Amino acid sequence: MLNQFSRTELIFGKEAMEKLAGSRVAIFGIGGVGGFTAEALARSGVGTLDIIDDDKVCLTNINRQIFATRKTVGRYKVEAAKERLLEINPDMTVNCWQTFYTPEIADQFDFSQYDYVVDAIDTVTGKIELVMNAQKCRTPIICSMGAGNKVDPTRFEVADIYSTSVCPLARVMRYELKKRGVRKLKVVYSKEKPITPADDMAISCKQHCVCPPGTKRKCTHRNQVPGSNAFVPSVVGLIIAGEVIKDITGFRGVK
């Protein structure tokens, strides 16, 4: 019988759809990258999503984040995301974690209960901690490298962290992971050299912060606020979703 996932089943098959329905995926960070990953996984039939983010929707998020609209500005991202995801698939389960992932709270998460972990956060400390905890439990994890200050979505690719180049974030991650004995890690990264954002005080988030009241990590506390657009982080998020779906189902297409 036809259902909302019938077109997806035409490609992946019934068994794969059953695997997706029975899977649980954790997405750490649901901004420009993680939001599109969550959207794609919900539209692909993943049964349970855990979404982790402590941020509120800001006016400046609207240019790139799928859960950010004029109506959701000021709301916690996980709340706005859950509402939309359940509109897409009312039968799925969405667990919200309104928290910022750091080593100090890592023990709140049991990584063994996840079929896959998505790292879409923007701090090196948090990313390293995610990788270490996921791999300790032998839970598959995929990490997003730098998506800010870039304009060519066609340059992004899936690779092992030790095969990456150019990306400044990937360089730091390689160094830190090697020190910790991590041998491999699937990432999505780009060889495009980052653009230096305009130094224009009139549009500076640090000078004219519009973060909603109650925002814990405001622009004024950041070393630099990167430039962004609608067509780069979204592509990264969709690439990640594709990898998660293919790995969970074991489907690789026509050889």
Language-model segments: which ranges?
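N-terminal charged helix/coil linker that caps or initiates catalytic domains
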Residues: 1-26
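Short, well-ordered coil/turn residues at beta-beta hairpins
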Residues: 120-121, 144
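Glycine-rich phosphate/adenylate-binding loop
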Residues: 2, 109-113, 125-126, 136, ...
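Conserved SAM/SAH-binding loop
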Residues: 98-106
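Glycine-rich phosphate-binding loop and adjoining beta1-alpha1-beta2 segment
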Residues: 46, 51-89
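Conserved N-terminal Rossmann-fold NAD(P)-binding element of oxidoreductases
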Residues: 27-29, 52
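Hydrophobic/small residue at the entry helix of a nucleotide-binding pocket
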Residues: 33-34
